[in-house]
Amino acid sequence: MTVKECYEKMGANYENVLSRLGGSEALVKRLVLKFLDDASYQKLEEQLLNKNVEEAFRAAHTLKGVCLNLGFDNLFTVSSDLTEKLRAKELDGADELFEKVKEQYEITVAALKNLD
């Protein structure tokens, strides 16, 4: 699967990120593959299980920023919603929002693992 096809599969904004990175598909590919090593999702999941709202907020905020920079609109939107919930130091409803993050994260990772 090409990088563009990968972005289409996950519902992300390939053209925007390609433009921001000077039109280099090789650079986009190199950066998005690094996402697979990013630990912010795992940290978010762990901190939510521990009911640590401050650390969960930091992890959600980091994930949101990475997704914004990589043009992963699908994952950015849901991680942004969770970030705002946690910014208010609220865990009430965070589990439901995390399930949306988890769904989009899994879609994103599955697409990235199919890159040529």
Features from the language model and the residues they span:
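Two-component system phosphorelay core
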Residues: 1-58, 62-116
